[in-house]
Each structure stands twice: as structure tokens, then as C-alpha cells.
């Protein structure tokens, strides 16, 4: 309705610049983190486009500007992020991102990205909550265990397969040797069976209950003959 009234009155409407940031960012002490800020404007990006990054501590306090950009970045010379801010943006592409280096636990707080592109100077002011923590030793320990498992388990499986193949090869060799091994005369005599009616040895396959061998039967016959005498 107001846009229609302004158009009818011959006045150009005031459009808002749209700025986007991720609501949360998580960093680790001593590491770096990139804080993304993107924007779109209803007007072409001009040479006088300006960006301000502000910071407020988590426990409250005043909001301070930590970086100002206009044609080039101007980081703060004093304050919590002195010498730890890097401009990562490209305003021509609607990017106003920065990076924070050497994070500290005292960096926890809220950061905002504000962009002006005259005459488009009105817009939302989003915020990112920065949370910095000490790297979890438990996570490091789990990572070491995982990497060790990825190396050990395949090696153990390969070793097990090799042992199984070696055992099967040894068993096949033993079976082959037993099959082709020549029996001694004593073993041959134990395999033969005497016919009770004849003195000639027979060589059929042994029954389930093994009968006395030839030599043993001959000895038994000798004992029987001596008893009769």
C-alpha cells in the first residue's frame, strides 16, 4: 500500500539491503574460523559500499567495531581481535566474510555484519554467536583408535586367510603322502587274513572288526600244535 502511494506521488521507494549470516559458529582454541556474511542489494554495488563488523562479549558489555571496510579493510588497532582479523570478502560478489585467527576462550560472544550500499542503506542486522572450546581429548583418542582399527583389522584378516590356506595345503600334503606311502612287510602281513580251511593267506578288505594278521595267526597255530603234543 505504501509502495503504491509513493509511486503515485512520484517518489522512489526505499528498498532494504538483505544480509545473511549463520546464527552459530564453533571454533577451537588456537585455530582459525571463517565467519561468512553475504548480502544482496536492490542497487548496483557502488564504490562507496561500506561494511562494519561488530563484536559484543558473551557476558555483556558494549558493542565495539572490530573491522571497517570501504574500498579496503581497516581492522582495529586495539581491542580483543587485534592482529587476528583477516578480510575474506569480495563486495562485488556480495561477500563480506572475515576470518579470525588464534582463537581464545575469551573470544566467545556475538558478532554482527552491517552493510551499506548507498542509497540502499537500510536492512536487517543479523548476528552470529561464536563459541570457542578446547579441543576434546576424548575425540582425539577416538580418532587414534579408529585409524588403528582401519589399519589393524584388514591386516589381521589377511593374516588369518593366509594361515587357513597354509593349514589346508599342509593337510592336503599329508593326505597325499599317506595315500602313496608303501606299507612294510609286517603291515602287509597284518592286512591279510587266513582261511581256516587252508594255509594260504587271503587278501580281501578287512572287516570293521580287524582280524588277527597272518603272522599272529601263524604264531597262534604253533602254540596250539605244541599244546597237542
From Swiss-Prot:
Q: Which UniProt keywords apply?
A: Cell adhesion, Disulfide bond, Glycoprotein, Immunoglobulin domain, Membrane, Signal, Transmembrane, Transmembrane helix
The name on file for this protein is Myelin protein zero-like protein 3
UniProt topological domain (Cytoplasmic) ranges: 165-229
Q: Which residues are glycosylated?
A: 108
Please describe what this protein does: Mediates homophilic cell-cell adhesion.
Q: Tell me the membrane topology, using the record's own terms.
A: Single-pass type I membrane protein
GO BP terms: cell adhesion
Chain ranges of the Ig-like V-type domain = 17-131
The cellular location(s) given in this protein's UniProt record come to: Membrane
PROSITE patterns assigned: IG_LIKE (PS50835)
The record ties this protein, via Pfam families, to: V-set
Q: Point out the signal peptide segment.
A: 1-16
Family to which this protein belongs: Belongs to the myelin P0 protein family.
Where in the chain are disulfide-linked cysteines found? 37-113
What is the scientific name of the source organism?
Xenopus laevis
Amino acid at each position: 500500500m505504501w509502495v503504491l502511494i509513493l509511486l503515485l506521488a512520484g517518489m522512489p521507494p526505499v528498498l532494504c539491503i538483505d544480509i545473511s549470516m549463520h546464527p552459530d559458529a564453533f571454533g577451537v582454541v588456537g585455530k582459525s574460523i571463517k565467519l561468512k556474511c553475504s548480502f544482496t542489494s536492490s542497487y548496483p554495488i557502488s564504490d562507496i559500499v561500506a561494511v562494519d563488523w561488530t563484536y559484543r562479549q558473551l557476558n555483556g558489555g558494549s558493542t565495539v567495531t572490530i573491522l571497517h571496510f570501504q574500498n579496503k579493510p581497516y581492522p582495529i588497532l586495539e581491542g580483543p581481535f587485534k592482529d587476528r582479523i583477516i578480510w575474506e570478502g569480495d563486495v562485488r560478489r556480495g561477500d563480506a566474510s572475515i576470518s579470525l585467527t588464534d582463537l581464545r576462550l575469551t573470544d566467545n560472544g556475538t558478532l554482527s555484519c552491517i552493510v551499506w550500499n548507498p542509497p540502499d542503506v537500510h536492512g536487517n542486522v543479523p548476528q552470529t554467536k561464536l563459541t570457542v572450546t578446547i579441543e576434546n581429548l576424548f575425540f582425539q583418542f577416538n580418532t587414534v583408535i579408529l585409524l588403528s582399527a582401519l589399519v589393524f583389522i584388514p591386516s589381521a584378516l589377511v593374516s588369518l586367510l593366509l594361515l587357513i590356506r597354509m593349514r589346508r595345503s599342509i593337510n592336503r600334503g599329508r593326505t597325499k603322502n599317506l595315500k602313496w606311502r608303501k606299507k612294510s612287510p609286517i603291515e602287509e602281513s597284518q592286512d591279510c587274513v587266513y582261511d581256516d580251511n587252508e594255509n594260504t593267506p587271503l587278501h580281501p578288505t578287512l572287516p570293521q572288526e580287524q582280524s588277527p594278521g597272518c603272522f599272529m595267526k601263524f604264531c597262534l597255530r604253533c602254540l596250539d600244535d605244541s599244546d597237542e603234543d
